[in-house]
UniProtKB/Swiss-Prot annotation:
HAMAP family: PlsX. Its EC number is 2.3.1.274. It catalyses: a fatty acyl-[ACP] + phosphate = an acyl phosphate + holo-[ACP]. It is found in: Cytoplasm. InterPro entries: FA_synthesis, Phospholipid_synth_PlsX-like. GO terms for molecular function: phosphate:acyl-[acyl carrier protein] acyltransferase activity. Belongs to the PlsX family. This is Phosphate acyltransferase. It comes from the Bacteria. Gene3D superfamilies: Isopropylmalate Dehydrogenase. Catalyzes the reversible formation of acyl-phosphate (acyl-PO(4)) from acyl-[acyl-carrier-protein] (acyl-ACP). This enzyme utilizes acyl-ACP as fatty acyl donor, but not acyl-CoA.
Length: 335
């Protein structure tokens, strides 16, 4: 049985969206147990009772405006902290939260801990492509500054995730840059390019540009945390703008626009599904000793369900256990 600790109080729509997503997951998957951390009475008002769901009550939670490291240290009974502690103590196999991103990353690093040999765990998410296959990208903001060695390690981590979680036999690795030529980019990008090109264990396809990401140019895209986060926000904003413009055009376009929308209803839903990255799950802080997944702060029940599904897949494939083994081999080889 796979045990998942969930911060029920994190996110814009907590605990309602969190608990409703849990209800869906419990019905869909018979091999998971959920531990919900938070206000018991509020959780119970939305929970469909199940012997595979338990509640650990706490009145304390980490707010969106709390300073991450301080919150983790001072709010020792916060729902997020207790969920992470359950993983560290072996009472749960993975942790999920839609709460304060910085605090969750801090909880992952300080409570769960990183895998030996991993210098900087990276925030990884599967983002949409026009063909629906998606691509994995990291780092999406766990680290504001990176070295070339960090990005080389992100390529290894991303390739490992794509193989074991998404089932891609030979993931194509691309380095996000301002041009596709090998000579493009600043000194960091040029150094990373050399490291990736010389690593025979990776299927490195070279530099990729931001404009080509959603066309599926690569299965894994590597970036420093600052750049990766900026690209993530751009993709999110573009998707929301496109859907907003379509809705507005239909609403004010009169009868012809509404008839056209009716005829294109199926295609419009397909477009919405393509741009909706929530169905791929949340962002993984990959490189920790256990799966830690951050769901978007605005997640609804559907997004929480898909994030639980993602965590279940990570546990089913034992991707973290295999990653520990892989890095221990590298560590032994370097000793």
């Amino acid at each position: 049985m796979k045990k998942i600790a969930i911060d029920a109080m994190g996110g814009d729509h907590a605990p309602k969206a969190i608990v409703e997503g849990v209800n869906q997951a419990i019905e869909a998957f018979s091999d998971i147990e959920i531990q919900l951390y938070g206000d018991q009475s509020r959780i119970e008002s939305y929970l469909v009772k199940s012997d595979r769901v338990s509640i650990v009550h706490t009145d304390e939670k980490i707010n969106s405006d709390d300073e991450p490291a301080k919150a983790i240290r001072r709010k020792k009974n916060a729902s997020m902290v207790l969920a992470a502690r359950a993983v560290k103590d072996g009472r749960a196999d993975a942790v999920l939260s839609a709460g304060n991103t910085g605090a969750l990353l801090a909880a992952g690093l300080f409570i769960i801990g990183r895998i030996k040999g991993v210098d900087r765990p990276g925030l990884l998410s599967t983002l949409p492509t026009v063909d629906g296959s998606g691509f994995d990208m990291l780092d999406l903001g766990a680290n504001a500054e990176n070295t070339a060695e960090h990005l080389h390690q992100y390529a290894i981590l991303g390739s490992f995730y794509a193989k074991h979680v998404r089932g891609i036999a030979k993931p194509r690795i691309g380095l996000l840059n301002n041009g596709t030529e090998a000579t493009k980019g600043d000194s960091l990008r040029k150094e990373v390019y050399k490291l990736l090109a010389s690593d025979s264990s990776l299927q490195f396809i070279g530099n990729v540009e931001a404009r080509d990401l959603m066309s599926g140019v690569a299965d894994v895209v590597v970036a420093d945390g600052f750049t990766g986060n900026a690209v993530l926000k751009s993709i999110e904003g573009t998707a929301m703008s496109i859907m907003g413009q379509l809705k507005s055009a239909i609403a004010v376009g009169g009868v012809k626009a509404k008839l056209g929308a009716l005829l294109l209803k199926g295609s419009l839903y397909d477009l919405k599904d393509t741009l909706d990255y929530s169905s791929a799950g949340g962002a993984v802080l990959f490189g920790l000793k256990a799966p830690l997944v951050k769901s978007h702060g605005s997640s609804d029940a559907k997004a929480i369900f898909h994030t639980i599904k993602q965590v279940r897949t990570m546990l089913e494939t034992d991707v973290v256990g295999q990653l520990v083994e892989e890095f221990s081999k590298e560590s032994d080889a370097n000793d």
